[in-house]
Amino acid sequence: MDSKPLEYLLGLNSDGSVKKVSEVFENLTVTNTVCAFIALFIIVPRVFDFLRNLFSPVISIPGPLINKFSPWPLEIATFKGKSHRFARALHRKYGPIVVLAPGMISIGDSQEIKRIIQSEDWAKSEAIYGNFRQDFHRPTLLAFTEKKAYSRRKRMLSSMFGIRYIRSLEPLMKSCVDAGVAHLNKLCDNPSKSTVINLQHFIHGLAIDTIGVTTFGGSFHVVENGSHPLPSRLKAGMKISAVMQLIGWIKYIPFLPKRDPYIEKFTFDIVDKRRKEAGAVKYQDLLQHLVDVCDDSPGSEFRTSDVQDESVILLAAGSETTANAELFTVIQLLKHPEVMKKLIAEVDKWYPPSEPDRVTECAYSQTGMTYLQACIDETMRLIPGQATGSPRETSKQESLLGYKIPRGTTVFPNTQEAHLDGSIWEQPEKYIPERWLEIYSQNQTSAMPYWPFSAGSRICVGKNFAFQEMHISLTTLLRKFTFEYVPGQDETTVFRIAQQLETDSYKVRVKKRF
């Protein structure tokens, strides 16, 4: 670039002497002004970024040189939904600590991960979760980065996720599963022949209906009707949110609404309806708990907009993560018929085929059906929902595996790497539920480097809800139906908020057992 625009910008003569202010403005042209603007607002900041990254301690951490100076490789991978594979490839090549982007690293060492998310309980990354908010100043429980504010919100909502309350939701969950069973019965009208169904659509529909009835007081009937506008809009929103976590400038695009207009109206109307019905109708769902603690007075920490945002997170994150865990569990069972056979034997032991009308009860069978739990745990070990972990941030200079980590660095505690660590797990990439039976017998589950729901203060509050839903759904479906593997299905995963199948379809054969 010609150096003259920079001379004008700095107010210098060609010999380096300082110009008078009047001379600077008299000699400015449109071209010089544009070039000076580019230099001041684009080139100069990039130079400072380059120098800051060059002299940062992060420069010594293993990883491609481009990652240490540019966020583009990570942003491109994130945009494609491949950030989990991007990180996995880097760890395989460079080891347990790698640079993902300037100011962002990934750690795959299980001891350091435990230290970050559990022992020292580092705060969530503002660089990531600051972009995961519909209102920057009013985060949801998921997106709080300030520990004290998070603790206040968690205490406010904690009663919604206790074992006792989750157990009270069991009849609502069963009603959705019963609707799913009735739907499959219609499809399997010939008991001697199997029917091909889209398992992904069915399980996701079942999870969405379950969240609908337990959160919003009514099923969305996705299983029976095939679709509903709200879940469809939420799924599209999740794709955008996944990209915005790392590409935050998207939210500054003019005329881009903070909230989807349909979702905004839906959630506002249902909250308004609850308030108008106060006292007349008694609801026992999660939304009612949110409405009960809502306060729109000045200075309130939990207003109507917060109820809307929290309910959307419950619906989107709750249905998506649980559905994917269920779906991947069934896929693994179909690909490992010997495991499926063993699990069916356990199901029949607890719920004999001679008692087809017996209701599936968590209080009766959830803790006793250890092989089912082993199958679920093994699935979440191999295909964790939070594949790259919940990103944390250094509040001071830290040391990880001997490397200095500057204050304000985003650290991804890569649970995917810990779950596949060959020094801890025998044959780590194979599906072996039996490994968990020994772990259970020794009461060592919490001691293992296994964090599908994270850990510490930021452990997923919906963990018990998810396990109860999965137990009811999988046990009931395996009691009633036989599922058969259809070869040739695309099992490629993408990571958008949660790890999920890239395709919208996964076909299986299903028929009635009896």
Swiss-Prot record:
Bilayer-crossing regions: 24-44
InterPro entries assigned to the protein according to its UniProt record, in alphabetical order: Cyt_P450, Cyt_P450_CS, Cyt_P450_E_grp-I, Cyt_P450_sf, Cytochrome_P450_monoxygenase
A cellular component annotation (GO) from this entry: membrane
Cofactor(s) the record lists: heme
Glycosylation sites: N225, N443
EC code: 1.-.-.-
Residues binding heme: C460
GO MF annotation: an example: iron ion binding
Disruption-associated phenotype: Accumulates 20-hydroxy-fusarin.
Highest rank taxon of the organism: Eukaryota
Functional summary from the UniProt entry: Cytochrome P450 monooxygenase; part of the gene cluster that mediates the biosynthesis of the mycotoxin fusarin C. Within the cluster, FUS1, FUS2, FUS8 and FUS9 are sufficient for fusarin production. The roles of the other FUS members are yet undetermined. The fusarin C synthetase FUS1 is responsible for the condensation of one acetyl-coenzyme A (CoA) unit with six malonyl-CoA units and the amide linkage of the arising heptaketide and homoserine, subsequently releasing the first intermediate, prefusarin, as an alcohol with an open ring structure.
Family recorded in the similarity comment: Belongs to the cytochrome P450 family.
Protein name stated in the entry: Cytochrome P450 monooxygenase FUS8
